[in-house]
Structure formats: C-alpha cells, structure tokens
C-alpha cells in the first residue's frame, strides 16, 4: 500500500493440497480423526500416493490425488474457510480471486463469503474464475466480477483474424480466423447484454492467463496485432489484467509452458519497445476517466475497421482501429459525436487535429493501426 499497490489473494476453497494439516491428521488417524468429514472419503485406507489406476479412495479435484476436495457442506470446513477469508483481509489484503468457485455449488456459502469480505473491507474486490457467462454469481450478492474470458475470444478473433494460431482449444474461448468488424461488434454487444453496466466496469478483462497460451503465441508472434489487442483491452469498460511477461514479449503455448518464470536475470532479452508501449497505454487509461468509467457505444463496424466512443462528464474519446493488413479509410457521422473537431491523443506525439466536414469525420488509417481522438470544444453544427 505504501507503493500505491493493492494485493489480491488467490483463494482456493474447493480443494486443498495433500500437505494440508487436517488431511495429514486424517491420513494418520483414519476414521478416528475429527477431520474425517472435512473431506469426501469413499473408504479406508486412503491412498494419497496411489499407483497407476488405483483409486485414492477420496474425492479430489479432477481426480488428482495431491488435491483433495474439501467438503464445504461441513460446518467446520465452512467456518475455517470464512476465518481464513477474514484473517487475510484484516491483515491488509485487498480482495480475493476465487479459484474454480463454480465447483462449490452452494450460493449460500458464497453469499456468506461476501458478507464476511465486505464487513472486513467494503472496498475489497471479489473476482471469480468463471469462464462461461456468470449471471448466477453477478447479481450483487456473491461476486463483484469474474475473469472475463468472454472478451478474450472476440478480441483475438478480430485483431488476429488473418494470422491466428488455432492449435489451442477451449470450450469457453472459441478462436477462429476471418472475423470481421461486424461480428466483433455483435460479440462485444452480446457480452455487454449479459450483466448490469456496473458489473462490466469491474470485470477482469484479460487476453491470456496461466491457464491458456500467451497472447503473442496465439497471434503467431504478430506484435502489431498484439498492440491493437492490448489497446482495445485498455480502452474497453472493465479492469484490464496484464499477465506477467506479456509486456516484454514472452510467448509460449498452453500450461505448463505459459507458466515459465519471468526472466529477471535476462533484461537484454526483453522487448523494451513493447514494454514502453504497455506503459504508454496504461498511462493513457489512467489519464482519462472516460476510458475507465465512461459510457460505451459503437460508432462504426465495417470490413476490418471498428470505432467506438467512450464518454464521461463532458469528455468524449473516439477509439478507431484498422485491423487489416492494408490501409483503410472510414467516415463517422457527426450525428453520434459531440464535436466537429477532434485532437489526436494516440499515437503519441501526433499534434494533429481532425475536423468533420459536411456531417462526416473522415479518417485514414495505415495497416494494423489505431487512433484515439478527443473531442474539441467546438460543437457539431
């Protein structure tokens, strides 16, 4: 906190490690252990290190013996988990990221979890790892947000439409080539229809994570496409999440390769231009509240070009993308804009003004490029 950072813990409440002390007690004492009902035991003896094809005799996450599943129906387990929840918030943690919370199929537990969290810190952030649409958990009585994989596929499919690695598959993140602007618009608008707008401002928007290939790998190392995808992520409603190492050009396939250590000892390997790009777009988002909590509306979606508006309390920004590999021109109607004069905010260093004529704001964009414009004081006639 002294460094203006907030820390969110990863809470794994569905299962534990094989070294968890109540599980050790159960292994040592069997049915005589007071913790026998903390787990889902099939029969004794338990086999924490089963041989091939042997049943460990207890429920485990994905049948992995080293990850015994907790019996969250047991009052002792519930009390312990809620004690842990409160303990770390009182210690000073700022929220919880919940691992596989859908596997604890108990809304009452999560409602009580929320009450404990918000009682300790009303500003604490609760974000669940739910890959699919999560209306059940986002009604205001359980989570604040989820890891928003619903935005991941549309962003990759649009900005990587001509050069996407399709060798990775997941039922909740559909990747495909050939996605145009209109389909991108439809997917994003369908995502926005899932929840109340207050939820979207809190959603953990991500391009990749420890559970999937890195963004650059999925884009076949196309750094121009990556920059557009990141710029889109940073200008959409939500809380953008950067997976460590993406900002220096780390590229790897799925688990475990995507989890390799950050190369602290090899700074010469880092892509410093890409790192500076990340710093710039993050600074841009921080500098303009409209990009964080402004309203959102598409202005244009045609071919491989997209434009949308972010607006808040008199500030209007227009974000424009050309995802194709050739130059493209677009025209925006001033009927949906608040001004006829716009200043270029992005790319940085371009001290240019764009002016609308005859009800149209005409823009020319190079291949795989973007513009961010800020409305001037002159109002449209």
Model-derived features: where do they sit?
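Active-site-proximal helices and loops of the catalytic beta/alpha 8
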Residues: 1-3, 14-15, 20, 24-31, ...
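Short, well-ordered coil/turn segments that N-cap beta-strands
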Residues: 3-5, 92-94, 121-124, 143, ...
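Short acidic (Asp/Glu) and glycine-rich catalytic loops that position anionic groups and cofactors
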Residues: 92-93, 208-212, 253-262
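Active-site clefts of carbohydrate-active enzymes
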Residues: 199-219
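Conserved glycine-rich, hydrophobic/aromatic-active-site segments
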Residues: 228-230
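Carbohydrate-interacting/catalytic domains
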Residues: 237, 242, 248-381
């Amino acid at each position: 906190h002294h460094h203006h950072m907030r820390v969110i813990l990863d809470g794994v409440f569905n299962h534990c490690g094989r070294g968890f002390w109540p599980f050790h007690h159960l292994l040592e004492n069997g049915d005589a252990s007071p913790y026998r009902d903390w787990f889902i035991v099939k029969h004794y003896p338990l086999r924490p290190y089963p041989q091939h094809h042997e049943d460990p005799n207890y429920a485990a996450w994905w049948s992995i013996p080293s990850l015994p599943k907790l019996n969250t129906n047991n009052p002792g387990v519930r009390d312990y988990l809620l004690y842990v929840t409160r303990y770390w918030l009182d210690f000073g943690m700022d929220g919880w990221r919940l691992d596989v919370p859908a596997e604890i199929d108990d809304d009452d537990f999560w409602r009580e979890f929320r009450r404990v969290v918000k009682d300790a810190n009303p500003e604490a952030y609760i974000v669940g790892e739910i890959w699919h649409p999560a209306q059940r958990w986002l009604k205001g009585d359980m989570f604040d947000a989820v890891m928003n994989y619903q935005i991941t596929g549309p962003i990759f499919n649009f900005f990587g439409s001509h050069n996407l690695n399709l060798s990775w598959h997941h039922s909740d993140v559909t990747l495909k080539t050939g996605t145009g602007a209109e389909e991108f618009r439809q997917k994003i608008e369908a995502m926005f229809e899932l929840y109340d707008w207050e939820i979207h401002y809190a959603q953990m928007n991500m391009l990749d994570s420890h559970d999937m290939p890195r963004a650059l790998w999925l884009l076949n190392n196309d750094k121009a496409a990556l920059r557009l995808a990141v710029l889109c992520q940073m200008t959409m409603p939500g809380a953008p999440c950067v997976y460590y190492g993406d900002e220096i050009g780390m590229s790897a396939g799925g688990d475990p390769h995507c989890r390799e250590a950050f190369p602290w000892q090899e700074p010469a390997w880092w892509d410093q231009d890409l790192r500076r790009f990340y710093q710039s777009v993050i600074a841009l988002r921080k500098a303009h509240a409209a990009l964080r909590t402004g309203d959102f509306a598409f202005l244009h979606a045609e071919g491989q070009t997209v434009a949308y508006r972010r607006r808040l309390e008199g500030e209007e920004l227009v974000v424009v993308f050309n995802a194709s590999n050739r130059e493209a021109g677009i025209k925006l109607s001033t009927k949906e804009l608040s001004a006829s004069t716009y200043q270029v905010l992005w790319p940085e260093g371009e001290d240019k003004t764009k002016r609308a004529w005859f009800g149209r704001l005409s823009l020319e964009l190079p291949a795989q490029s973007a513009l961010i414009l800020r409305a001037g004081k002159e109002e449209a006639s």
